[in-house]
Amino acid sequence: MGFVYRGFLLRSKSIQLVESNRWTLQVVVSIHKDSGSEPREQTFSSENFFSSKEMADMEGIIFARKIIDGEIPGLSIDLL
């Protein structure tokens, strides 16, 4: 599932940890810079754990929005 935020497409790709049945978030942020070109994308992850895929997906989108807004030190979309 994807969400658009400030012109960026955000896609959550949560990962289940087999050894603990918990989930960790991974989110892909992409943007089309030029019409007809391939999208540029960057993947971000966190070391936080969640009890369900739904929670990890929701937190992944929130995490990506914070990265776009410059609220997560050390992470940015400047390379896109």
PLM features per residue range, with description:
Residues 1-3, 34-43, 78-80:
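A mid-sequence interfacial segment
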Residues 6, 18-20, 38-43, 70:
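Contiguous segments within soluble domain cores/interaction surfaces
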Residues 9, 13, 18-20, 37, ...:
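Residues in flexible loops and secondary-structure boundaries
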